[in-house]
Curated annotation (Swiss-Prot):
Homotetramer, a dimer of dimers. One homotetramer interacts with 1 SecA dimer. Belongs to the SecB family. Gene3D superfamilies: SecB-like. The keyword Transport applies. This is Protein-export protein SecB. It is found in: Cytoplasm. Keywords: Chaperone, Cytoplasm, Protein transport, Translocation, Transport. CDD domains: Translocase_SecB. It comes from Rickettsia africae (strain ESF-5).
Length: 152
């Protein structure tokens, strides 16, 4: 049997997820029902993702917001457009402030992304389409790309 020493856990660096929530969700299905009958080929999907980080009033508390937009089109129709703002409140405990930017830009979005992905898949399926399964995102690569763009 193992015993957990809570004194040690309180001083260990860790990220705590205090809340996760939908801030905004919109799905447009503008050409239904005609577009639902025209699903003989895979639609073109245009996907955009942005991350917003807000420093909250309590020390070391941050809101990390994923903004995801997907537009599906085929030759005839704009099939659907979905926009989701999904956020989490994170507490960075006993973590050096120099490490905060990378944790907030990489680790925290990676923690909440699967939930946002599931919401988008469910909504697109409920709109009469195949569920939109967004591929996993390498938030580390996005962060490094953004940092290199800022240095240039």
């Amino acid at each position: 049997m193992s015993t957990i020493n809570t004194d040690t856990n309180e001083t260990m660096p860790h990220v705590s997820v205090n809340a996760q929530y939908i801030k905004d969700l919109s799905l447009e299905n503008p050409s239904a029902p005609s577009s639902l009958a025209a699903l003989d080929q895979r639609p073109q999907i245009d996907l955009s993702l942005d991350i917003n980080i807000t420093n909250l009033s309590e020390e070391n508390f941050y809101e990390v917001e994923l903004n995801i937009e997907a537009i599906a089109r085929n030759e005839k129709y704009k099939l659907f457009q979905i926009e989701l703002k999904y956020a989490g409140v994170f507490n960075l405990i006993n973590i050096d402030s120099e490490q905060h930017p990378v944790l907030l830009s990489v680790h925290c979005p990676a923690m909440i992304f699967p939930f946002a992905r599931k919401i988008i898949a469910s909504c697109t399926q409920d709109a009469g389409f195949q569920p939109l399964m967004i591929d996993p995102i390498d938030f580390g690569a996005l962060y490094h790309k953004k940092m290199s763009e800022h240095q240039n």
